[in-house]
Amino acid sequence: MSRKSVMSSTFEPSLSTSRQPLGPSLADTLPSINFGFDELRDRMAKFTAKFDAFIEQGRKRVLEERNQFRMNVAELQEDQRMKKKDIEILQLKTNTYQQTMAKEAAETREMQAAIASLTEQRDKQAAMRDALKEQIAATQREIDARLAAQRAHAAQLEAQARYNVPELDFWVTNLCMRIEGAGAEDRLKFVYTHIDERNWEREAWFELSMSGRDYDVRHCRPKLEREKVEKVLDRVNETRELVVLLKGMRELFVEAMKS
């Protein structure tokens, strides 16, 4: 029941009472009092309208805030998803970079090992080259010394030959021998005949080497004892007289033919 009906029923006289043909009642004699119910109703209506508007605005604001919150959450979720994707990409790049660095480090170690090996080989080859250079230089010095000795010896022989040609012709005739080349510049072949009483045409020969300072007999036919040949060579190299060699070798051949 509304307040208007309640108040009407409370303060207004009933129909039965108003219908009674009585004289003025005590209530009719009371002064009229204005309680301001209309103004109160207007104020209540305005308050209700304001309250409803406030509630509606609050509801709209709550909806807007909820929608904004949902949008913010969606944006945050999207940002989180993008950040997660960025992190995955960065992690993949980091793994790739680490693998590349490890590969480069391994390649660097291999290159350093190869460089060390090549350096060691270079040092060995340099040492070997220096040793070969020294060996070549020593060999060249030895060759030069031998060539100088040979030239000196050849000059000596040439000088001696100029004086010994008549004597050599004498011994060639008397020792029944001839001189031939032995296929080398520093060798001579001496061939004897009339050393075998049973066959005067039988020949014996030896090759004389003059490549060094001392004379040396390299080959002979028939073969002679090396010790006896060395004794003859010792006398020749001591006296430097070729006739000693020619006579000594003939004696050895005659002795060999008789045995």
From Swiss-Prot:
GO (cellular component) term, any one: nucleus
InterPro entries (UniProt xref): Spc25, Spc25_C
Residue runs in coiled coils: 59-162
Example GO BP: cell division
Subcellular location: Nucleus; Chromosome, Centromere, Kinetochore
Regions of compositional bias (Polar residues) in chain numbering: 1-20
Region annotated Disordered, chain positions: 1-25
Pfam families membership: Spindle_Spc25 (PF08234)
Keyword annotations from UniProtKB, A to Z: Cell cycle, Cell division, Centromere, Chromosome, Coiled coil, Kinetochore, Mitosis, Nucleus
Residues making up the signal peptide according to the UniProt record: none
PANTHER family from the UniProt entry: KINETOCHORE PROTEIN SPC25, KINETOCHORE PROTEIN SPC25-RELATED
Task of the protein: Acts as a component of the essential kinetochore-associated NDC80 complex, which is required for chromosome segregation and spindle checkpoint activity.
Complex and partners: Component of the NDC80 complex, which consists of kpr-1/ndc80, kpr-2/nuf2, kpr-3/spc24 and kpr-4/spc25.
Protein family (similarity comment): Belongs to the SPC25 family.
The protein's name in its UniProt record: Probable kinetochore protein spc25
Lineage, highest ranks first: Eukaryota, Fungi, Dikarya, Ascomycota, Pezizomycotina
Gene behind this protein: kpr-4
